[in-house]
Amino acid sequence: MKCSWREGNKIQLLENGEQYYPAVFKAIGEAQERIILETFIWFEDDVGKQLHAALLAAAQRGVKAEVLLDGYGSPDLSDEFVNELTAAGVVFRYYDPRPRLFGMRTNVFRRMHRKIVVIDARIAFIGGLNYSAEHMSSYGPEAKQDYAVRLEGPIVEDILQFELENLPGQSAARRWWRRHHKAEENRQPGEAQVLLVWRDNEEHRDDIERHYLKMLTQARREVIIANAYFFPGYRFLHALRKAARRGVRIKLIIQGEPDMPIVRVGARLLYNYLVKGGVQVFEYRRRPLHGKVALMDDHWATVGSSNLDPLSLSLNLEANVIIHDRHFNQTLRDNLNGIIAADCQQVDETMLPKRTWWNLTKSVLAFHFLRHFPALVGWLPAHTPRLAQVDPPAQPTMETQDRVETENTGVKP
């Protein structure tokens, strides 16, 4: 499948759970024919129970509902919680679940990290939010800052088709060679234009990164990137510095209060390289940053699930939308500049790690390890990801799959 730029869309930025969850639950409540929902994390907390209730009500009124969860991100939903949905007719699947080893999850690589909802081929949501109370301000200091978009218009057809082609039973010809797709060019830039881009482990391995690189090459005035987990490869870092050196104002917002300490360690290894290259780096200090958004000049923007780290850029299944729209760009710009002014600390010379031989050695080793991390993972024994569908009673039937597909004739379509 290859997507093209779609015109005539309605695009709405949604910030955090306070805006995202009511919009999603309302759309589910108004669904008439079909719901497709996939996410990395679904917790059995207050937010998770609201999603459960919305899907249950939809299924009970005859709406066809399908859910795909990641087996690593959502391992602990109770049988009772899931059974109630499957008994009502919800098709409930886990992407590549595996048993724990000494109580530890082992399936950490090549995860299904997308967050997409499609309602009746009319409305779609895509972004970085999971279904967890962690995305609500009421959660406290550890509540996550995140973004998504609500979409209406022709782009929804592309997102629906993408979902349908990745459902079980939809086989695709596999090629022994790897094809690389150029970033889809918008030959007639306008307003309300949206393009779906994704990353998989087949023909679209670096599509999202290619769009970022193309954006940095085309930038003329300003780029703002807000990304939770920032440790891209050398090509990306070089493109950032190159843009800054030709006079583009580059603002990079990263976690200052990370949910994982290693995130700060990794990002700070890059501070010298970025700051001395003219990139303005801001640490978001109010709470953990979980967003994956960016904008360029006055028309280009992206929102989605892809971080800028080795897992998202080289291993996980991800999905973003690229948006050409001045109003949306300005809305996102106002939001990001607002959190820079209110909740960020700019990294200056005093915050840079001292340039000692030890720090330099650590930086070089860490950088090259993370740079080659995906290739190292590729040397591990290969396995074919599996899809587990939960049918009442809740005894998963395992189906071999690669794209999220199956040959089990008993699986619901």
From Swiss-Prot:
Gene Ontology terms: biological process: cardiolipin biosynthetic process
Highest taxon listed in the record's lineage: Bacteria
Stretches for region Disordered: 390-413
Activity regulation (UniProt): Activated by phosphate. Inhibited by cardiolipin and phosphatidate.
Cellular localization per UniProt: Cell membrane
EC number: 2.7.8.-
Keywords in alphabetical order: Cell membrane, Lipid biosynthesis, Lipid metabolism, Membrane, Phospholipid biosynthesis, Phospholipid metabolism, Repeat, Transferase
Species in which this protein is naturally found: Escherichia coli (strain K12)
Family named by the database record: Belongs to the phospholipase D family. Cardiolipin synthase subfamily. ClsB sub-subfamily.
Name of the featured protein: Cardiolipin synthase B
Disruption phenotype: Triple deletion of clsA, clsB and clsC results in a complete lack of cardiolipin, regardless of growth phase or growth conditions.
Reaction(s) catalysed by this chain's protein: 2 a 1,2-diacyl-sn-glycero-3-phospho-(1'-sn-glycerol) = a cardiolipin + glycerol
Function description: Catalyzes the phosphatidyl group transfer from one phosphatidylglycerol molecule to another to form cardiolipin (CL) (diphosphatidylglycerol) and glycerol. Can also catalyze phosphatidyl group transfer to water to form phosphatidate.
Comment field (misc): All three cardiolipin synthases (ClsA, ClsB and ClsC) contribute to CL synthesis in stationary phase. Only ClsA contributes to synthesis during logarithmic growth phase.
Segments forming a coiled coil: none
GO cellular component, as recorded: membrane; plasma membrane
Positions of the PLD phosphodiesterase domain: 108-135, 285-312
